[in-house]
């Protein structure tokens, strides 16, 4: 059976791999995402390109150390009318992000990349479109009070498979993309890998 190395410390992504019977070990890339995002934004890269570049960079970095192993890098970004929304650093920032998204449509872009020996061999990027309900500030605070710090940072503000679903009026796109790991596409690649 193929073993996959996850270039991330995301417990959520690891759990998804485990639930899908994909043998994996964790080796965080420790890539400084903020510096890379700022550089790519300066170069006028699209949110989709930023997500794809980060996933590839993470996979390539770890795969250079883990020769002959398949390494999975992943990244997700929120695009609000061209503005890149990053993970919150604390609950105050999480509230500000939710207020920004409140009553609006945004794109959630998820990218995955598999690399071997420091070179990408496969990648996939998908976009889901989410329309958030118009919720009072008190309602947003109540939502934030219900989720753990770990969930808050792991899911980039909203935990769609939990109470986060109630924040949205309309969700268009693949559930795997929204969960930030397009697992069906990863399994397709692994099943065809020789």
Locations of regions flagged by a protein language model:
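N-terminal polybasic phosphate/anion-binding patch
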Residues: 1-70, 84, 138, 142-145, ...
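Structural motif
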Residues: 3, 69-70, 106-107, 111, ...
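Amphipathic, non-transmembrane alpha-helical scaffold segments
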Residues: 51-52, 98, 176-179
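Generic enzyme active-site microenvironment
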Residues: 73
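Active-site-adjacent loop/tail segments of enzyme domains
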Residues: 76-106, 132
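Short beta-strand-to-turn element immediately C-terminal to the catalytic PLP-Schiff-base lysine
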Residues: 79, 113-115, 169-170
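Anionic-ligand binding region
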Residues: 111-123, 127
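Active-site oxyanion/phosphate-handling segment shared across diverse enzymes
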Residues: 123-194
